[in-house]
């Protein structure tokens, strides 16, 4: 049976207490711009409490690199992508851009401009890491938007499962230092992986805890 540990608080503070190479795979979606619907039905960018970066990105990356033994995948905004990519490009290992191509992109101002139908992530595998179960697979993942929308930037469940299956084996530890509403944790328990999650916002932490506990009780 999968095990899980959840922390409510600042991820940088908790990361500093974790041992080197103590998790196998870090899969996270760091805070960045989300969207809000205006009175005329169009959608505009906004920054809500759950979407604002509250920590130093380079400090965060150094800590994530330190605690992860195998591979890392970080979803991010376009403004953050080059910083994250360049950070890992200067480490020993292999870095790749990951593209989530949404099969049902949101029509945000689509009558005026091209739809924003993709999200980006940076994937990194440490030098000497052994686990990779996606042989000869490319870096484009095609899945629809997440449906439950418990969090403004929630990821598709099947997308998260696919990344977890690609980068871990059963019983491995998956880590999400910005877990939001707990989607990564749910995907871990559904694939027999162990999970460690951190969330700063109390509202989303409680949602994540309830979701993960519900799945854990069903899989006993």
Predicted feature descriptions by range:
Residues 2-196, 205-206:
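Core catalytic lobe of class I
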Residues 203-214:
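Short alpha-helix adjacent to the SAM-binding motif of class I
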Residues 199-200:
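Conserved acidic E/D residue at the C-terminus of a beta-strand in Rossmann-like folds
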Residues 1-3, 212-220:
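Positively charged, low-complexity nucleic-acid-binding target-recognition regions
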């Amino acid at each position: 049976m999968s095990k899980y540990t959840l922390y409510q608080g600042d991820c940088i503070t908790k990361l500093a207490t974790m041992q080197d190479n103590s998790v196998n795979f870090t899969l996270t979606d760091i805070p960045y711009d989300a969207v809000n619907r205006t009175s005329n039905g169009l959608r505009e960018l906004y920054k809500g409490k759950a979407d604002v970066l509250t920590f130093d990105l380079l400090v965060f990356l150094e800590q994530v690199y330190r605690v992860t033994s195998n591979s890392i995948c970080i979803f991010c905004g376009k403004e953050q992508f080059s910083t994250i990519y360049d950070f890992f490009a200067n480490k020993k290992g292999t870095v790749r851009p990951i593209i989530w191509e949404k099969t049902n992109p949101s029509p945000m101002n689509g009558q005026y401009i091209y739809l924003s139908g993709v999200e980006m992530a940076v994937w990194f595998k440490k030098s000497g890491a052994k686990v990779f179960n996606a042989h000869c697979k490319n870096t484009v993942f095609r899945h629809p938007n997440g449906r439950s929308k418990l969090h403004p930037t929630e990821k598709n469940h099947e997308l998260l499962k696919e990344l977890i299956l690609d980068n871990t084996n059963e019983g491995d530890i998956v880590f999400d230092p910005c877990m939001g509403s707990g989607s990564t944790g749910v995907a871990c328990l559904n694939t027999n992986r162990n999970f460690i999650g951190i969330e700063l916002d109390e509202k989303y932490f409680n949602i994540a805890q309830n979701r993960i506990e519900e799945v854990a009780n069903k899989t006993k």
